[in-house]
UniProtKB/Swiss-Prot annotation:
Annotated catalysed reactions: RNA(n) + a ribonucleoside 5'-triphosphate = RNA(n+1) + diphosphate
Record flagged with keyword Zinc-finger: no
Site (Cleavage) location in chain: 172-173, 407-408, 640-641, 721-722
Uppermost EC category: hydrolase
Organism taxonomic ancestry: Viruses, Riboviria, Orthornavirae, Pisuviricota, Stelpaviricetes
Modification(s) after translation: Cleaved by the viral and host proteases. The protease is probably autocatalytically cleaved.
Coiled-coil boundaries: 109-143
Gene that this sequence comes from: ORF1
Keyword Repeat: no
Region (Disordered): 687-708, 822-844
Disulfide partners: none
Listed name of the protein: Non-structural polyprotein 1A
InterPro entries (alphabetical): Astro_1A, Peptidase_S1_PA, Peptidase_S1_PA_chymotrypsin
Keywords: Coiled coil, Covalent protein-RNA linkage, Host membrane, Hydrolase, Membrane, Phosphoprotein, Protease, Serine protease, Transmembrane, Transmembrane helix, Viral RNA replication
Amino acid sequence: MNVYDKVLQFGSKKARARGMALNKLSRNRLEDIYAGSGPLVFGFGPIDMVDPGSLNPSIKTLDTVYVAAVQPDNQYVVHHFVPGRNEWVETDASTHQPTALVGVLVQDHKAKTREVEDLKSQLSQLRMEHEILRHEYERLKLKSPIVKPFKPLKVLLFSLLLGLLFAGVTNGARTGTCYAYDEEKDTCLYWEWKDSREVAWYDSYVTEALAIYNRACVYVRSKEFMTYLSLVFQTVFNWYFCATALAVYYMARAENPIVMFVTLALATLSQFQLLAVAVLPLLDFSATMGLWLSMVVFYMSQQISILVSFCVLVLSVMIGTFMADSEYAMMIKGHAVVFAIVCYSHVAMILNIPPWVVSLTMVCYRLWRVCFVFPAERLEIRSADGKVLHTVPTHPNWTAKVTRFVQSLRKGLRTSVAPTARIVPDGIAIVEAREGVGTCFRVKNNLVTSKHVVGSDDAVKIRWGAQEDMARVTYRHPTKDIALMALPTNLQTMPAYKFAKAITDGPIVMTAFDEANLLLVAVTEGVRVEDHMTYSVATRNGMSGAPITTVDGRVIAVHQTNTGFTGGAVIFVPEDIPEVRKISKREQELEDRVKQLEGMLNMDQAYVDSNLIVDLVREAVQREMKVLRTELANLGGFSQKKKGKNKSTKRKRKAVWTEEEYKAMLEKGFTRDQLRIMADAIRDQYYDDEDEQSEEEAGYPDWSDPGDSTDIENEWFGYEQSWKELEPAKSGVVVNTLPKDLVFKYSLDNYPISKQDIQAVAKELKIYEKAISDIISTSVSTDGKWKDDVDAQKILQELDGLWWGINHTLWEHGLMPFTQRRKRVQQPKNSKGALKTRAPKSAN
């Protein structure tokens, strides 16, 4: 019934075994009566029953099985089994102290367990509310401004860059006249400077702006309009203005702007200007280094710079062959861009193309790509079967990576590590269904996954390593996102997960496959909220149905949600797996027969009220009984005393068999106790020994109308056959049977065999008859004696085994064994014969 009852097993073991056998025949089961109770105690006790075999009602005391336990409401309840009714009935009996004490403790333990579960649920709810409030507090809390530390190196580099940029727009040249010159010393003795002033860097811009303004005011449609427009472009796309703005931006926002400062400085010296900045998103590390090298060489010699960039491109083509296709293509693309801008810059220098035209060209190219091409940010590298191997960004932008790398170094060090966890790498498999792909794992003889993975499919494909097979979906949980599948034959060696004893907040482990079929293991903190588990972990497609385990490898939940970084799972406990009860062949036949009868009943168009039929039968029986009473009352002298009741002496018990018959039966293997029981049974068929001293009037008992239809149904249909569940037991003692009586004892010729027997076990009966015939013919001579080379005990043991086997086969098919059937009566060989089927004559 429960674990306490299995361990303690109070009461008599014999009574327990008998009670379990009777429980199979009972209309109400002990599992339902004592559901949720403590340990049971079994014992034998008396019960008063009305003897149905006598004409006069009499009370007969029988021994039956008593069962007692403490119910969930702490009530000590006792039931006993009532034969005939085949039902457990509540009764009053003495209290078994150990059972009562343990039962009360069990119920108290269950109450405390429920209380603890409620407290855990409340604690989880409070923790979740605390996390929400803490998040809201952090959101509403006023953040203090972050003061960045003063870095002299950054300021120095920024000052040098500004000085380099402003040096290109300043005019520091001064002219004059030498009036006295010393040829020996090659020096000017008297120099007169001309009146000149240093041109400020903004004078040209102011002059140009005023000129544009004046000319626009005079006449906007003049021929010089295009000149004005070119001046505007020169102002907007001026390299020094753009470089200054970019340097200020990186100075304020970037943690490490040195890389950008170096690029801007080299672009200013080499006159690459905006070209160098515009192509940075297309360059990886090697291409960025090639750009720096080309700009340095370009400052010294343009022709050599073109040669150097081309050599670097060829070298990258040759050396990069060991790299992956995506990385190789990205590197070649970057070096090709470097070679192209070096050539473009050289052509611009030769043709005296203004710098603003080059800048405008790059801006137009980038605008065209953004507005019309719509380039993707990432490229997915897939295999031949469509699996995503990895993703590659279309713009490597190595300079941005360097900035992020430096920022990552500024993060605080971890003060703790994740706990060591036990994983089962071969314990999960991939589920492929029409709705998508997921993960599954084995628990007992079931494969478990999420219900939304299998969808409405009846069968899905399971891939476990190199093995593939189809699995049938056997169960979908009504309230949880859990589905069970039958374990295929090819996956019998798959490791199985075990359930955790308790599910609490703490470290959890998720083992799953991602969409690229890579094994991922994550250890994080999980929080239980009612029937769900929440945790923060990077989740991907294909992880649905993955097992969520403790650090000991015990399963506690099934992963179901995927929001990118936060995950969720549904709690998985043993109660979520339905209990599978094995249906016997007899029960299956009865179910099929019931369905057949229900179908026939549904096809019948004529509906007959069952209550009307019962009333008609009751009226007919009552009318017939009245007629019989009248006829019996009109018969004279019908009432008489029983024979043998008018004598004061007790009737003598006569022998049932003759001496020869008695000895012959002893030789056949029957014991004296067995013959005595058989003789008493034969005498009981002809004599009434209950009231030998009393004189009663023979006749029918008084008739009384039944109270309701229930009494009639119990009287007519309230009996069941109890032989079905009584399994034949194999005897351990071999009876010494004479060889000439083997055929009579083991042959089936003396037993009635029905049509149902032949339909069910015809093959087994034929095999049994042939085996019996072969054994007897090879071990018994024609004169009815054992052969010389035969071991009689071994032959008898073999015959007993065959006899027990055929009876057990009948019992398995729901048929009455031969041990419970009556043999056909044979005429005895003596002249007197057996006891006649009438009472012996009186001695008087």
